[in-house]
Amino acid sequence: MIARGTHREGRIPPFMTNNHSVFYDEEFGTHSVEATIDNGDFGSRTIRLETGQLARQANGSVVAYLDEDTMMLSTTTASSKPREGFDFFPLTVDVEERMYAAGRIPGSFFRREGRPGTDAILACRLIDRPLRPTFVKGLRNEVQVIVTVMSLDPKDMYDVVAINAASASTQLSGLPVSGPVGGVRMALIVDDDHEDGQWVAFPTREQHESALFEMVVAGRLTDEQVPEKPRKGRRRGRKSSPRKKTDNVAIMMVEAGATETVVERVNDGAPAPTESVVAEGIEAAKPFIAELCGAQQALRQAVDPETEEFPLFPPYGADVLAAVDSEAKGRISDIMSIADKQERDEALSSDMDDTVEALLEEFPEREAEIRAAHNAVTKEVVRSRILADGFRIDGRGVEDIRDLDVEVDLVPRAHGSSLFQRGETQILGVTTLDTLKMEQQVDSLGPVDHRRYIHHYNFPPYSTGETGRVGSPKRREIGHGALAERALKPMIPSRDDFPYTIRQVSEALGSNGSTSMGSVCASTLSLYNAGVPLKAPVAGIAMGLVSGEVKGKMTYVTLTDILGAEDAFGDMDFKVAGTEDFITALQLDTKLDGIPSDVLAGALKQAREARLEILNTMAEVIDEPDPMSDYAPRITTISVPVSKIGEVIGPKGKNINQITEDTGARVSIEDDGTVFISATSGGSAEAAVDRINEIANPQLPKVGERFLGTVVKTTAFGAFVSILPNRDGLVHISKLGGKKRIEKVEDVVNVGDKLEVEIADIDNRGKISLVPVDD
């Protein structure tokens, strides 16, 4: 047995450098490298990547640290043989949130982690989207990337660190991948010292809360710079490395959104997150991405992993592609001019079958290749017509939006509903309101433990005319719901202004391009129909891009309101949501090595013009909150002294339960004395308010007042009757039974009986004497 010290600073001397020096620990056999994130006035953060100690049997493993206390393990493994019958790359990304990372025990019945939560699923998607394109095409071995969050500083967010950890472990796995991916979260901080705002990388939770706008940006280097291989030794010396440039950083993914206080901050003079500001943020992320990619390159060069041989399965051979092109290109060109999606899909499917039948004799046992080549020819036809003629599948111009159809108040008993149609994309929005007691409780590693605005997105198989599984949401549905929620959340009124929990459901009833942005539009309409006073209406649009050489010149054509086929065959999926004044959410995925800044700026400008057109169409139907539905709960807010909260609740909730039983209203009390009263009618709410005020602000009853009370206790000398909350009086036995003498109180009244009484006397100690009221 060998006893080894485990203090981190004893094993790796704590120094930081931008030169990507690799540290090697001979005792433990570990390599590590640091990337320093310099935020100027806001300090610096350090990302450390280490390999060689944990999970040694995985193809590649890396432990990533953010500063000292945030730590996660990423492993990349691959199956030994390719999966038969697969025509796609089977990559799986999983994020495991361990509650011990935050020093907590899971709140589930079994006290162990179960299914991944929403935060973990969204982190999986953030990793998958930029990582998947780095694998060589034609790979069919199963690849699994698992990121396990082991320690989390409460001030940090782990998801972007996980992107870098997953990329680093994949770089060391020996799998056929291109260069590393770097991911960074950028927050636009505006304060007294930075009135124009400064973009801060890897912001803390505190900075996140005070930010105006935030984005996650992932990218890679287009020309790899490989540092020297380090010499062995306990500590590696500093060495110079090529100066990082940002013009060699290709942006692969952007996920962005405004914060909840953006409207108030902009009204107070802060810069609005307009298209130009967002573009500046993307550019500001590039130096940090270069730094992170450089660190991963240095680590890979130091470890020098053995690259394994993996069989590749190209989708088709050149001979098959040439034959399909000759056989079917003319027919495909005609088919791709059909505007109706269903008719076009049926014709294309039929032509694919005809092409297979025509070529199968020439290429026996290569049917899958023929079909894949048919898809490739279809893609080439669509792209070339857009580039050469600006001609789209459905005949629109490149900046045209499909026909819009807007309707509200469709679902009879829903609190709010809408139908938004953009071409063949059809979204039903449904809003439900309830008390703040119905806030979603979140058991995750983050500090957020509840959600007041909840957005759910459903994508049933019939929306594309297909059959499939229904039930629990898939990762895509969770991701689309999160995007729509991020777009709308900054416009949701505060708890004080609108004390309701809001659940918004987006039902994708028909899909042909950007159901997520359709969900944003439908949700704005539905929320207005439900009476929710949004700070401003929000709309969204999906943009696309097709690039290629035309007459020897590189040409970029930006498409507004893309179809599903244009998304699949294009180079970019760019979703932009916002108000009339600024962007509230943005999502970008691209297949290119980089989008020129002027092309990106043009796409943002084009998206704004489309957004304004959609907002105008929506405003023609509804432009302000409707009266609330008769079926929605009415919530009244009052305040009681904090010292009276216990009295209002009563022993074991006796008083508050009695108020609910008597009035039909639901009552919830906050720690600051705010009381929320929910009722289906105004009368019930008023009755509950009166009962609460009687307890919290009691007034002494007067002699001669009459009450319909409840007998709460009987004794040998009389009956105690409750006339007000926490206020009882005694009816002496001599006053019961009229003029007749009775032996037992129970011969006349019992506990629970209603009895009309009058106050006969109140002594100097406040004790109340009652007498029954004769009919």
From Swiss-Prot:
Q: Where in the cell is it found?
A: Cytoplasm
Q: Does the keyword Ribonucleoprotein apply?
A: no
Listed EC numbers: 2.7.7.8
According to UniProt, the reaction catalysed is: RNA(n+1) + phosphate = RNA(n) + a ribonucleoside 5'-diphosphate
Q: Where does Mg(2+) bind?
A: 567, 573
Q: List the disulfide bonds.
A: none
Q: Which family does it belong to?
A: Belongs to the polyribonucleotide nucleotidyltransferase family.
Provide the protein name: Polyribonucleotide nucleotidyltransferase
The source organism is Corynebacterium kroppenstedtii (strain DSM 44385 / JCM 11950 / CIP 105744 / CCUG 35717)
Q: Which gene encodes it?
A: pnp
